Amino acid sequence: MFEALKEVLGEINSKLAAVNNELSSKIMSENIVSTRPVAQAQYCGPYKLEKTLGKGQTGLVKTGTHCITGRKVAIKIVNKEKLSESVLQKVEREIAIMKLIEHPHVLHLYDVYENKKYLYLLLEHVSGGELFDYLVRKGRLMSKEARKFFRQIISALDFCHAHNICHRDLKPENLLLDERNNIKVADFGMASLQVEGSMLETSCGSPHYACPEVIRGEKYDGRKADVWSCGVILYALLVGALPFDDDNLRNLLEKVKRGVFHIPHFVPADVQSLLRAMIEVDPGKRYSLADVFKHPWVSGTTKADPELELPMSQVVQTHVIPGEDSIDPDVLRHMNCLGCFKDKQKLINELLSPKHNTEKMVYFLLLDRKRRRPAQEDDTEIVLRGAAQNNDPPKKRTDSSRTSRYPMGSIADGSPINPRKTYGRNQKSGRHSSLGGSPTESPRSSTRDLFGSSSSGSYSARAGEDRDRGRSASRSTNSYHYYTQPVDPQTLAEAARHVRDAQERRESRDSGRGSSRKESKDRSDKSASSSSCKNDASSTSSVPHKYSPPSVMSESVVVSSSTMNSTNSSTNSLIAGNSQTSIGSTSGPWRSKLNNIKNSFLGTPRFHRRKMSNGTAESDSEDSQMIDTTDLVKKSWFGSLASSMSVERDDTHCVPVQGKTLNSIKAELIRAFLQIHELSHSVVGQNCFRVEYKRGPTVGGSVFSRGIKMNVDIIPSPQQVVIAGETPTYVVQFVLLAGPVRRFKRLVEHLSAILQNSTQQRADRQQQAALMVRPRRLSDSSVGSACSDSESNASSINMIARHSDKTETTSATSSDPYGPSPSMRSVGSGTANSYKSPTPHRRNTTAVTASSSSASNRYGPSSSSSGSYSNNADYSYHPEYSQRSNGSSAPKNQYSPGSQRSFAFSMFNKADKV
């Protein structure tokens, strides 16, 4: 028996073991299948893929974080298997174009990774989102903010056009904002290289922003097409809508072809002229980008002429390539991806030409980019870490060869020998400086005042000194154009010797003031932690005997700011940048002192720079990095707490209402809600309404329009003392739930004007108007009723008499400007002409009798007649004190004579019925 039990238990155990093995194998297989796709998209080189930012036409965009440095990038993932060959060629063209352009307001391309299935583009990460969302959230912008954005857009566009690149798809969706609300032009998928003297043919872009010649399918100039798109964007910034909009695509295209649009009245006149010139149907009459820069609204208050980009044909120095073997294959591959260089053999022939041409210019631009930012393999440990669980890890596109392997000959015929870009107008700033070769590095200074707005303190002093020394002797490190060839060593040594001689002459000139210089240095060290650069300059100028050398101070500050990758434009020369070690190595304390001064200048940019910018005439330029503390408070976690203490709230308005009951306030509110077009309301409480105002199709459509949602509450005044017999005071509270603040304010102002226009206020205005009766002689043609001139005369006299002495008798004609009451008509006047019921369509041409002629003196304080009657309260009718006069809130002297008497007839009819 025991043996039988053992056999049964053994069979049960074996079956349980088999079931466990099957379950464990299934769980293992499910885990492997579920983890495979996650492991594939987990790493891209040293970057860990994180959340999805958005989805575009060609792929997905995710954030990536460097696993060592923590630097964030935006990774655009393109599925090569799902896209056609033509779309992939556009992606390759976008890569080549973005390698040509490096500008502070253009999104940067760092590196490219790929595997068999995907293509990964590592782009600059910006946290501000799209300009489109910013417009939808904020509504139309003020002129100052719109000008700042517009300047940055045309600055980037001018740089692209100088490189013969046309964007062709400019719209707010392709304009991104960084953390400082600066523009970054993105999405060069539609961009094209337009060779000088040629026209573009491809119709592309968005219909709302495309120019008429593109929609008609004609050949067009890409530069003029971009100007049209910029005009539409400027219209959207200032108006909050689009100039051409329609739900039907065919109708929209017809509107764009006609080019007829309406500019609202609130747009300034100078901006209206700019919009008309940019959104011009005829490309020949349309503004060029140079004309846009010269426009008074764009230049602002600065008197200096704007500095445009020079064409690259006048900037890039090209050389003779000895043979086909000397052509860099990587650069040749990138040029092949550009649409205008599809014929490879023709491209090679142009590159081997001894003359300066467009092909050679683009070649040396890309070659210089490769020299400055070589694509090298990633660290082995990082690659192994990312590829440990991935069968096909993304690999970085690297250079197949070094640039030093390919020799170059002499300068090409027609090439600029001394490029003006290096020595010329960009010496004062770093507008087009290189922005860091790796995404792990911070961009070197890139901001530049395109319109000549002056900086303060030592920066402007340094710029002035550089101009005094001569343009050929000093060049800004950041303004040294990175597309030109390296500086000749002999030229560099000559420039260094020139700078050293200038410094020695300056030191010898100031040698007699050594003691005062020491005192000035001590004073500057003490005030460095609490004063700005501008205050230091003013204190130095106020004490003539204490001299501080501005050259050493300003140069040191600039060197330290460029070392720390400051956002300000550095103005130190290339030689000063190379000799900064000698300046810092002469004495140890100088380095710490300079760092202290630098920290005092740059340590708290949010507040002390804001104070410095208050006195400037043009503080809204695209390069001003001033941070508005109000915006920072709104973005912070403690925004609601800080705004309640320091920032004035705009989403709640209270309107006090006096002399009205609760029911009358409700009735007036509901009447006002019903009278406003496109406004709907609902009752959510006994004294509470929910109001929603939706704008219909405007001039630009509803692309950027947003409705308003608000609560309207009627509450008793908390600070009133209720007295018996008096109407309590109420407060109507308007609370914004959603929508633009400016539109909410306008709606509240309209409703408050209706609520506060009480009966007593109207009566007071009528009394004041009655005391200001102007004498006038009414002819028969101007009287549109049965009343005669004598009635008008007596009416004016009796109105004055009533205010001077209420008990005094008046003329027998009438004491009421609107006509006598029925009870008055029964009283005889003693004249030949007795009053009867007036007729609205008959004019009374009866002559004035002798009894009424005594009232012809219109200036007398009172008047009496032989046939007078007692002005008792039982028989008199005073419309200015009666509730029946509520239908007219305007003073009496604002009515025309005919309208006044016709209104009196309506009052007669009501009195007769009573």
From Swiss-Prot:
Protein function: Regulates both neuronal polarity and synaptic organization when bound to strd-1. Kinase activity is required for the establishment, but not the maintenance, of both processes. Binding to nab-1 is essential for role in restricting axonal fate during neuronal polarization but is not required for regulating synapse morphology.
Binding site for ATP: L53, G54, K55, G56, Q57, T58, G59, L60, V61, K76
Quaternary structure, from the entry: Interacts with strd-1 and nab-1.
Protein name: Serine/threonine kinase SAD-1
One Gene Ontology term, aspect cellular component: axon
Bias kind Polar residues: ranges: 473-482, 574-590, 823-837, 882-903
GO biological process terms on file: axo-dendritic transport; axon guidance; axonogenesis; establishment of cell polarity; establishment or maintenance of cell polarity; G2/M transition of mitotic cell cycle; presynapse organization; protein localization
Limits of the Protein kinase domain: 47-298
PROSITE patterns cross-referenced by the UniProt entry: PROTEIN_KINASE_ATP, PROTEIN_KINASE_DOM, PROTEIN_KINASE_ST
Catalytic activity, as annotated: L-seryl-[protein] + ATP = O-phospho-L-seryl-[protein] + ADP + H(+); L-threonyl-[protein] + ATP = O-phospho-L-threonyl-[protein] + ADP + H(+)
Cofactor(s), by name: Mg(2+)
SUPFAM superfamilies per UniProt: Protein kinase-like (PK-like)
Biased composition (Basic and acidic residues): 393-402, 495-526
Biological classification of the source: Eukaryota, Metazoa, Ecdysozoa, Nematoda, Chromadorea
Keywords annotated in UniProt: ATP-binding, Kinase, Magnesium, Metal-binding, Neurogenesis, Nucleotide-binding, Serine/threonine-protein kinase, Synapse, Transferase
Name of the gene: sad-1
Signal sequence coordinates: none
Biased composition (Low complexity): 444-462, 527-551, 563-573, 780-796, 850-876
Region (Disordered): 375-551, 563-590, 757-914
Highest rank taxon of the organism: Eukaryota
Stored InterPro entries: BRSK1_2-like_UBA, Kinase-like_dom_sf, Prot_kinase_dom, Protein_kinase_ATP_BS, Ser/Thr_kinase_AS
Tissue expr: Expressed in neurons. Colocalizes with strd-1 along the dorsal nerve cord.
